[in-house]
A protein has these predicted regions:
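N-terminal Lys/Arg-rich, disordered targeting/topogenic segments
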Residues: 1-3
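A domain-start/cap signature at the N-terminus of enzymes
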Residues: 6-77, 89-90, 101, 131-134, ...
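Short substrate-entry loop that stabilizes the transition state in hydrolases
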Residues: 71-117, 200-201
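Glycine-rich nucleophile elbow surrounding the catalytic serine of serine-hydrolase chemistry
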Residues: 82, 169-178
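Surface-exposed patches in mature extracellular/periplasmic domains of secreted proteins
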Residues: 111-112, 158-166
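Conserved acidic catalytic loop of the alpha/beta-hydrolase fold
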Residues: 143-162
């Protein structure tokens, strides 16, 4: 096996090729389903696909929604954050009955990834850092994607909502807890983090994601 010097390190040529291809797949090539036209939400179960970031269309995200028949913009909005399995639609279905009874607009973003079992930085860690360890701009944080989705709900439906609630289970619980810590300007009214496997402690001496240090 051929060994080469790369950034001062002795690594195999195969390792370099894998790293380059991984970088291209994760951060250069377009990812996600095709965007759907902007339109108002349908009553009942629905979904749409939008750009995850405001400054580029490179990454898209599917958003599942459930709008009760009697819901009005004066009622509650609840973001439901899925677990490690990235199965947002299942979480939406589990909440739909109570949402109908309580007049809650459900919003379940789907942070899809083929590598969800080995990559955690993009979702439950908020995408503050890339898989390769460098810091991402706040505009590409997963927490910012939630705010972008909330903006899309307002503009596409002529709503004038100014706050939302958010619940997360398992990996979604990690997401919610870290979002509260790292994005305090988010328009969150109430947040519930359930069954999180790990937490970020308010300790700058501990590097993120287990603390808030760099």
């Amino acid at each position: 096996m051929k060994i080469i010097k790369w950034f001062g390190l002795s690594v195999s040529l195969l390792t370099v090729i894998i790293l380059i291809l991984g970088y291209l797949y994760l951060y250069v090539l377009p990812t996600g389903p095709e965007k759907t036209p902007v339109r108002p939400l349908s009553v009942g179960k629905d979904s749409f696909v939008m750009s995850a970031y405001q400054h580029t269309d490179r990454k898209t995200i599917r958003v599942w929604t459930y709008k009760p028949a009697q819901w009005t913009p004066k009622d509650s909005v609840l973001f439901v954050m899925h677990g490690m399995g990235r199965n947002a639609e299942d979480y939406l279905d589990a909440w739909s009955d109570i949402a109908e009874r309580k007049r809650i607009l459900l919003v379940a973003p789907e942070f899809a990834s083929q590598f969800y079992r080995v990559i955690t930085n993009d979702y439950q860690e908020g995408n503050l850092k890339s898989f390769f360890g460098w810091s991402n701009p706040e505009s590409e944080w997963a927490f910012t994607v939630i705010e972008n989705i909330f903006d899309r709900l307002n503009t596409a439906n002529d709503f004038d909502l100014d706050e939302y609630n958010i619940f997360g289970h398992s990996a979604g619980g990690q997401f919610v807890q870290r979002m509260i810590l790292m994005k305090p300007n988010a328009r969150i009214k109430t947040a519930i983090a359930g069954n999180a496997g790990t937490y970020s402690f308010v300790d700058k001496a501990v590097p993120y994601p287990y603390g808030i240090g760099t």
